[in-house]
Amino acid sequence: MGKIEVINHPLIQHKLSILRRTDTSTKAFRELVDEIAMLMGYEVLRDLPLEDVEIETPITKTVQKQLAGKKLAIVPILRAGIGMVDGLLNLVPAAKVGHIGMYRDEETLQPVEYLVKLPEDIDQRQIFVVDPMLATGGSAILAVDSLKKRGASNIKFVCLVSAPEGVKALQEAHPDVEIFTAALDERLNEHGYIVPGLGDAGDRLFGTK
Protein backbone atom coordinates (compact mmCIF):
# COMPACT_ATOMS: atom_id res chain seq x y z
CA MET A 1 0.00 0.00 0.00
CA GLY A 2 1.25 3.48 -0.81
CA LYS A 3 2.52 5.95 1.74
CA ILE A 4 0.48 8.91 2.96
CA GLU A 5 1.77 11.84 4.99
CA VAL A 6 -0.60 14.18 6.80
CA ILE A 7 1.24 17.46 7.36
CA ASN A 8 0.10 18.72 10.76
CA HIS A 9 2.08 21.97 11.01
CA PRO A 10 0.22 24.48 13.22
CA LEU A 11 0.27 27.23 10.56
CA ILE A 12 -1.17 24.88 7.96
CA GLN A 13 -3.92 23.69 10.29
CA HIS A 14 -4.80 27.27 11.26
CA LYS A 15 -5.05 28.41 7.65
CA LEU A 16 -6.98 25.29 6.69
CA SER A 17 -9.60 26.05 9.34
CA ILE A 18 -10.16 29.49 7.78
CA LEU A 19 -10.26 27.92 4.31
CA ARG A 20 -13.09 25.60 5.35
CA ARG A 21 -15.38 28.38 6.61
CA THR A 22 -18.41 29.23 4.49
CA ASP A 23 -17.86 32.96 5.07
CA THR A 24 -14.32 32.98 3.64
CA SER A 25 -14.30 35.22 0.55
CA THR A 26 -13.08 34.15 -2.88
CA LYS A 27 -10.04 36.44 -2.53
CA ALA A 28 -9.13 35.05 0.88
CA PHE A 29 -9.76 31.47 -0.27
CA ARG A 30 -7.39 31.93 -3.21
CA GLU A 31 -4.69 33.44 -1.01
CA LEU A 32 -5.02 30.69 1.60
CA VAL A 33 -4.73 27.89 -0.98
CA ASP A 34 -1.54 29.53 -2.26
CA GLU A 35 -0.11 29.93 1.25
CA ILE A 36 -0.95 26.39 2.37
CA ALA A 37 0.56 24.92 -0.80
CA MET A 38 3.79 26.80 -0.15
CA LEU A 39 3.92 25.72 3.49
CA MET A 40 3.29 22.11 2.48
CA GLY A 41 6.09 22.44 -0.05
CA TYR A 42 8.76 22.39 2.64
CA GLU A 43 7.74 18.83 3.54
CA VAL A 44 6.85 17.71 0.03
CA LEU A 45 10.28 18.78 -1.25
CA ARG A 46 12.21 17.42 1.71
CA ASP A 47 14.04 14.69 -0.22
CA LEU A 48 15.39 16.85 -3.06
CA PRO A 49 19.06 15.92 -3.59
CA LEU A 50 21.84 18.34 -2.69
CA GLU A 51 25.37 18.75 -4.00
CA ASP A 52 28.48 20.56 -2.78
CA VAL A 53 29.35 23.92 -4.30
CA GLU A 54 32.32 26.17 -3.60
CA ILE A 55 31.35 29.78 -2.92
CA GLU A 56 33.04 32.88 -1.59
CA THR A 57 31.58 34.82 1.32
CA PRO A 58 32.81 38.30 2.31
CA ILE A 59 35.12 36.47 4.73
CA THR A 60 36.47 33.37 2.98
CA LYS A 61 35.96 30.63 0.43
CA THR A 62 33.80 27.74 1.64
CA VAL A 63 31.98 24.64 0.44
CA GLN A 64 28.22 24.77 0.94
CA LYS A 65 25.12 22.96 -0.34
CA GLN A 66 22.83 23.67 -3.29
CA LEU A 67 20.05 21.79 -5.04
CA ALA A 68 21.54 19.20 -7.36
CA GLY A 69 19.56 20.36 -10.38
CA LYS A 70 17.01 17.54 -10.35
CA LYS A 71 14.34 18.18 -12.96
CA LEU A 72 10.93 18.89 -11.44
CA ALA A 73 7.43 19.30 -12.84
CA ILE A 74 4.28 20.57 -11.15
CA VAL A 75 1.13 19.21 -12.78
CA PRO A 76 -2.18 20.70 -11.61
CA ILE A 77 -5.45 18.91 -12.32
CA LEU A 78 -7.65 21.60 -13.86
CA ARG A 79 -9.21 23.66 -12.78
CA ALA A 80 -8.81 23.76 -9.00
CA GLY A 81 -5.21 22.52 -9.06
CA ILE A 82 -4.12 25.82 -10.61
CA GLY A 83 -4.57 27.46 -7.21
CA MET A 84 -1.70 25.44 -5.73
CA VAL A 85 0.90 25.99 -8.45
CA ASP A 86 2.34 29.38 -7.49
CA GLY A 87 2.85 28.34 -3.87
CA LEU A 88 5.19 25.54 -4.97
CA LEU A 89 6.80 27.61 -7.74
CA ASN A 90 7.81 30.17 -5.11
CA LEU A 91 10.06 27.45 -3.64
CA VAL A 92 11.27 25.83 -6.88
CA PRO A 93 10.93 28.50 -9.60
CA ALA A 94 12.85 26.43 -12.15
CA ALA A 95 10.20 23.68 -12.16
CA LYS A 96 8.22 23.19 -15.36
CA VAL A 97 4.41 23.26 -15.20
CA GLY A 98 2.18 20.82 -17.06
CA HIS A 99 -1.62 20.68 -17.12
CA ILE A 100 -4.17 17.88 -17.07
CA GLY A 101 -7.77 18.97 -17.63
CA MET A 102 -10.77 16.89 -16.59
CA TYR A 103 -14.52 17.20 -16.22
CA ARG A 104 -17.08 14.92 -14.62
CA ASP A 105 -19.47 13.05 -16.91
CA GLU A 106 -22.93 13.85 -15.57
CA GLU A 107 -24.28 10.39 -16.42
CA THR A 108 -21.48 8.14 -15.24
CA LEU A 109 -20.04 10.61 -12.68
CA GLN A 110 -16.60 9.48 -13.86
CA PRO A 111 -13.80 11.93 -14.74
CA VAL A 112 -13.13 12.51 -18.44
CA GLU A 113 -9.77 13.84 -19.63
CA TYR A 114 -9.99 16.71 -22.13
CA LEU A 115 -6.50 18.26 -22.01
CA VAL A 116 -2.95 17.03 -21.46
CA LYS A 117 -0.11 19.53 -21.86
CA LEU A 118 3.20 18.34 -20.39
CA PRO A 119 6.93 19.08 -20.70
CA GLU A 120 8.49 16.98 -23.48
CA ASP A 121 10.90 15.37 -21.01
CA ILE A 122 8.20 14.48 -18.47
CA ASP A 123 9.60 10.95 -18.22
CA GLN A 124 12.83 12.38 -16.76
CA ARG A 125 11.21 14.61 -14.14
CA GLN A 126 10.09 14.22 -10.55
CA ILE A 127 6.41 15.12 -10.74
CA PHE A 128 4.09 16.72 -8.20
CA VAL A 129 0.44 16.32 -9.16
CA VAL A 130 -1.58 18.96 -7.31
CA ASP A 131 -5.32 19.19 -6.63
CA PRO A 132 -6.89 20.73 -3.50
CA MET A 133 -9.24 17.76 -3.04
CA LEU A 134 -8.77 13.99 -3.06
CA ALA A 135 -12.39 12.83 -2.86
CA THR A 136 -13.28 9.65 -4.77
CA GLY A 137 -9.78 9.44 -6.20
CA GLY A 138 -11.05 9.15 -9.78
CA SER A 139 -9.37 12.28 -11.13
CA ALA A 140 -6.11 11.56 -9.32
CA ILE A 141 -5.98 8.00 -10.66
CA LEU A 142 -6.71 9.15 -14.22
CA ALA A 143 -4.04 11.87 -13.98
CA VAL A 144 -1.40 9.41 -12.78
CA ASP A 145 -2.48 6.93 -15.47
CA SER A 146 -1.96 9.63 -18.07
CA LEU A 147 1.50 10.52 -16.75
CA LYS A 148 2.64 6.90 -16.60
CA LYS A 149 1.49 6.31 -20.18
CA ARG A 150 3.97 9.03 -21.14
CA GLY A 151 6.84 7.37 -19.29
CA ALA A 152 6.70 9.18 -15.93
CA SER A 153 7.62 7.09 -12.90
CA ASN A 154 8.56 9.45 -10.06
CA ILE A 155 5.20 10.90 -9.01
CA LYS A 156 3.85 12.44 -5.80
CA PHE A 157 0.28 13.61 -5.20
CA VAL A 158 -0.28 16.78 -3.15
CA CYS A 159 -3.70 17.87 -1.87
CA LEU A 160 -5.14 20.02 0.90
CA VAL A 161 -8.05 17.83 2.01
CA SER A 162 -8.57 14.11 1.43
CA ALA A 163 -11.20 11.47 2.13
CA PRO A 164 -10.35 7.91 3.23
CA GLU A 165 -12.18 6.54 0.17
CA GLY A 166 -10.03 8.56 -2.24
CA VAL A 167 -6.80 7.75 -0.44
CA LYS A 168 -7.62 4.03 -0.54
CA ALA A 169 -8.53 4.14 -4.23
CA LEU A 170 -5.36 6.00 -5.24
CA GLN A 171 -3.16 3.75 -3.11
CA GLU A 172 -4.68 0.61 -4.61
CA ALA A 173 -4.37 1.90 -8.18
CA HIS A 174 -0.90 3.41 -7.76
CA PRO A 175 0.87 2.12 -4.62
CA ASP A 176 4.12 3.77 -5.75
CA VAL A 177 2.65 7.29 -5.54
CA GLU A 178 3.22 9.02 -2.20
CA ILE A 179 0.31 11.17 -1.00
CA PHE A 180 0.78 14.43 0.90
CA THR A 181 -2.30 16.02 2.47
CA ALA A 182 -3.00 18.73 5.04
CA ALA A 183 -6.08 16.88 6.35
CA LEU A 184 -7.56 13.39 6.21
CA ASP A 185 -11.27 14.03 6.72
CA GLU A 186 -14.06 11.69 7.86
CA ARG A 187 -15.75 10.41 4.71
CA LEU A 188 -17.57 11.20 1.46
CA ASN A 189 -21.27 12.06 1.49
CA GLU A 190 -23.84 10.66 -0.96
CA HIS A 191 -22.95 13.38 -3.48
CA GLY A 192 -19.23 12.59 -3.43
CA TYR A 193 -18.24 15.63 -1.36
CA ILE A 194 -15.69 15.36 1.44
CA VAL A 195 -17.10 15.69 4.98
CA PRO A 196 -16.47 18.10 6.65
CA GLY A 197 -14.40 19.24 3.66
CA LEU A 198 -14.51 22.76 2.26
CA GLY A 199 -17.08 22.56 -0.52
CA ASP A 200 -16.17 22.75 -4.21
CA ALA A 201 -12.60 24.05 -4.33
CA GLY A 202 -12.82 25.17 -7.97
CA ASP A 203 -16.01 27.15 -7.40
CA ARG A 204 -14.57 28.81 -4.32
CA LEU A 205 -11.22 29.61 -5.96
CA PHE A 206 -12.69 31.28 -9.02
CA GLY A 207 -16.08 32.46 -7.80
CA THR A 208 -17.89 30.53 -10.54
CA LYS A 209 -19.87 27.30 -10.70
Swiss-Prot record:
Binds 1 Mg(2+) ion per subunit. The magnesium is bound as Mg-PRPP. Its cofactor is Mg(2+). GO terms for molecular function: GTP binding; magnesium ion binding; uracil phosphoribosyltransferase activity. It catalyses: UMP + diphosphate = 5-phospho-alpha-D-ribose 1-diphosphate + uracil. One of its GO terms (biological process) is UMP salvage. Transmembrane segments: none annotated. Uracil binds at residues 194, 199-201. Pathway: Pyrimidine metabolism; UMP biosynthesis via salvage pathway; UMP from uracil: step 1/1. Its EC number is 2.4.2.9. It is an enzyme of class 2 (transferase). 5-phospho-alpha-D-ribose 1-diphosphate binds at residues 79, 104, 131-139, 200. Catalyzes the conversion of uracil and 5-phospho-alpha-D-ribose 1-diphosphate (PRPP) to UMP and diphosphate. This is Uracil phosphoribosyltransferase. It comes from Streptococcus pneumoniae serotype 4 (strain ATCC BAA-334 / TIGR4).
